[in-house]
């Protein structure tokens, strides 16, 4: 196991254009991790081919699409609201039962257990687009070849590396939370449940094994793949393509990418998020669709959420600028 967090000097000397120090010295992960990650990535594409073949000439069952949409929304909001805005950044305070429900829903998205996910994301904010960032598209520099390699690394390649993020440093609060630790330990079972439920519901609704299998394909494997690639696109595309209306820290190239706003539940307003990481709303400008923020607002009105960090108009106005903020402080929540 390798923890590749660079010395302070390397981070301070980074010029924002060159490859990260040690970028080519990334040992591969162990065989078991590579195998599991490859299976999670490849199997949904096989499922897509099988599902298209099975539906050829007769179309996709409406129940399969409805189940896929329901599971996509539930698990997606579990990641965006639970893993990200609540547990990583503390954008609001949730009732204990809601914390657990959101953590369970996020775990069913097949993106890693809650402790690892939060630790990696806090590390990403601490070292955004500079040495130490676990999935920056600028890892191999800003030239064309380096940028293409970096996009592949940020989107998916980093999952195959042996670059561990220490939970004890980046998520000690969750490590000490017994409920979150239990949810993390249950991650394999929750992944199994995420695929079993569509199968069982498809069987119950259609009354046939064929209906169960097609529901498993569309609402199980294919739904998982879509959510994963949308999340990974925020890591990769939302640091390269799009607009940067707000000031961020030095070297931070996070962008707003509107085509992904709905599918990502507002996560693709990434520049707004990196400008104000603890804000419960990522779409900081008028007209920016942010379903996750809308759901948090509903939780607040129901009394399930409190201490919500909503945008401060005066502060947002001050953050609007063309130049990045020169700030090298190492704050894991930013």
Question: In which residue ranges do the predicted regions lie?
Answer:
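Non-catalytic, topology-defining segments of multipass membrane proteins
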Residues: 1-232, 237, 279-334
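Substrate-binding/catalytic groove segments of enzymes
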Residues: 242, 269-280
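Active-site-proximal inter-transmembrane loops
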Residues: 171-179, 243-269
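Pore-loop/selectivity-filter region of tetrameric P-loop cation channels
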Residues: 76, 162, 261-274
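Membrane-interface module
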Residues: 112-116, 256-258, 265, 275
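Helix-loop boundary elements of multi-pass alpha-helical membrane proteins
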Residues: 91, 240-245
């Amino acid at each position: 196991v390798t923890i590749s967090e660079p010395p302070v000097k390397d981070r301070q000397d980074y010029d924002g254009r060159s490859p990260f120090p040690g970028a080519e010295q990334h040992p591969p992960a162990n065989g078991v991790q590579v195998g599991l990650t490859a299976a999670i990535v490849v199997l949904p594409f096989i499922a897509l081919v099988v599902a298209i073949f099975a539906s050829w000439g007769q179309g996709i069952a409406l129940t399969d699409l409805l189940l896929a949409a329901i599971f996509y929304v539930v698990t997606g909001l579990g990641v965006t609201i639970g893993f990200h805005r609540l547990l990583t950044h503390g954008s609001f305070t949730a009732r204990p039962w809601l914390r657990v429900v959101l953590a369970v829903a996020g775990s069913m998205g097949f993106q890693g257990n809650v402790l690892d996910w939060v630790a990696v994301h806090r590390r990403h904010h601490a070292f955004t687009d500079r040495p130490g960032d676990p999935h920056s598209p600028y890892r191999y520099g800003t030239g064309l070849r380096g940028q293409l390699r970096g996009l592949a690394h940020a989107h998916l390649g980093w999952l195959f590396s042996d670059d561990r993020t220490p939970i004890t440093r980046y998520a000690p609060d969750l490590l000490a939370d017994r409920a979150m630790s239990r949810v993390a330990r249950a991650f394999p079972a929750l992944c199994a449940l995420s695929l079993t439920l569509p199968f069982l519901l498809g069987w119950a609704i259609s009354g046939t094994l064929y209906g169960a299998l097609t529901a498993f394909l569309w609402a199980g494997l294919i739904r998982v793949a879509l959510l994963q690639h949308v999340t990974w696109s925020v890591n990769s595309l939302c640091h390269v393509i799009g607009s940067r209306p707000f000031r961020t820290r030095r070297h931070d190239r996070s962008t707003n990418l509107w085509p992904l706003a709905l599918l990502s539940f507002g996560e693709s307003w990434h520049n707004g998020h990196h400008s104000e990481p603890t804000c419960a709303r990522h779409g900081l400008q008028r007209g920016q669709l942010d379903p996750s923020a809308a759901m948090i607002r509903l939780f607040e009105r129901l009394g399930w959420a409190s201490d919500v960090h909503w945008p401060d108009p005066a502060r947002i106005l001050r953050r609007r600028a063309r130049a990045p903020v020169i700030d090298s402080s190492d704050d894991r929540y930013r």
